């Protein structure tokens, strides 16, 4: 992924004497620029003569007083922590003591013969291969060196031809003087040596200059600068000065001087403190942009292929997760089915069914025994009540002529007794209809017992109410659950 552009808000305040490197607009191009440019002083950001920060120059800042009455200045204030003197913005060590100059590294440039021989191969391979930014810079330097060497060769050949045209007899005399020397040296070795006359340079018919093809012959010049004494006017007109190689300080290297004198620098460049390597970084940035433009289509195709691969990987992961989910659902359903099957098998077990039926039978037997005892008690009470009624009737036979026998009526049953009868707990709620019938018989027996008790108490109440019966009016009737009222009769 490409790193985002570091364009943010202003990090340093406007009235601060320091400017952070991210606030510098020239650093928007490359990240290497950002690292190389240090934190700078920002004193005069306004128009000329109108500073936003200080109305005086930087040299007068040390002369300012602390304020107040005392105009003296301490020695510690000069080297205070906020003072820009304490900040070492650039490494100003002498270049002769730097490790890169003490340990001389061999130049990565190839030899001239290799450049001339492999010129065609490098051009064909450079077009096919994907150039890196460093390789592009090296190729540019190599190409510029080739062009300049070819231009120098052409200029030197032109100068030699002009010189030959000016003084041909001197060159011919030199050749004729060299021939007897060669002849004398060869006489000792080869006795049968035939002298060959020197061919003239100019033909009498054509009056033209012939090219002497002596590759091993070296022409000795009279002076050291005889061939290379070229003026500015003699330089080729199509020479592009922008493509000339430059050294580390930005000076142009012309010819072979730059390669032989790499360790010599000017006085200004060695002592300057405001050196900013932004120009070199700009050149590197331009070369990187060229490489990026050349490789833009390939980068786009690679990004598209990578995105397609990522999309396919995500689709595969989604399908795998779906399969896992289906497997989990299937396992859960199978587990539930197995649990239900085991429960049904347990419920259908004959031993459990036999135990349940035996418990139901025992419960029914206990209920029947309880009902039998209740019926026995009711019968006992009925026999006792019949004997009491017989004795009471024998006592009242003598007074039967005087007192008319009142009609017996059923006594009222209280509400509490009815609730008790209704709210009797059924021990076997889920039993069969036979158990319900037996419980109904039990309740009937209890009600009959209560009625018998009421009949036993009735004669005594009848004897006590004879006086009221003999009076004019009397209420007659019986009430059990629903009150029944008899009409009033006058006697």
From Swiss-Prot:
GO terms for cellular component: cellular bud; cellular bud neck; cellular bud tip; cortical endoplasmic reticulum; incipient cellular bud site; mitochondrial outer membrane; mitochondrion. The modification Phosphothreonine is found at residue 12. The modification Phosphoserine is found at residues 16, 37. GO terms for molecular function: phospholipid binding. InterPro entries: MMR1. Its main location: other. The keyword Iron does not apply. The keyword Mitochondrion applies. Involved in the guiding of mitochondrial tubules to the bud tip during cell division. Interacts with MYO2 and PCL7. This is Mitochondrial MYO2 receptor-related protein 1. The lineage of its organism: Eukaryota, Fungi, Dikarya, Ascomycota, Saccharomycotina. The gene is MMR1.
